[in-house]
Amino acid sequence: TRTAYTKNTMDAYGLAEYHYSQQYLKFCGRRMELAQLQNFVEADRMFLWWAVTGQGGAGKSRLALEFLKRSHRDFFGFFLNYAVDPEEVRRFKPFNDTVAIVDYVKGNEAEIAVIFAILIDKFSSGPYKLRILLLERENTTEFGSWHHDLITAMAPYYRQECNDAEYNLELSTKNHRFLYLDDLDGAAV
């Protein structure tokens, strides 16, 4: 029964309690993916970006959250809303190696391009590493993809910076450009 003192966790569909941030379901599996994310943040370069891709419900956001929880001593990490006011991002002062995670890139490429530029400038002259991790369903770089639209939304300088700073590019293939979350196998569950 609901009273005035009961926290309302219901949304329009009654599923708010299952949102990844609630951590209602125990995180399981994805050891290899967590290790790949750890390698991403530990790489020697000062600025790198990468993406985690997979179908809706594959666990991209939960994986990123779990990674931040397990690695919080190594770097400062946070989810950054693509709709953040650019002035808020400009006020950020780097104080540690940092991982910024942006979910839902498709349709928000212009806003995210601005965020990239500001963060690149913020970290370019300091001693701290910057990692940007994008979460998106689509795993392609073809014309019209979120990747293509994001890169072309950037000013030429930042476009070159991002082209040079894509993590694991030398190991990628056309079908596996980014960290792709496939279905969990039975052993992982």
Region roles according to the model:
Residues T1-F123, Y128-T141, W146-E166, T173-L181:
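Walker A/P-loop phosphate-binding element recognition
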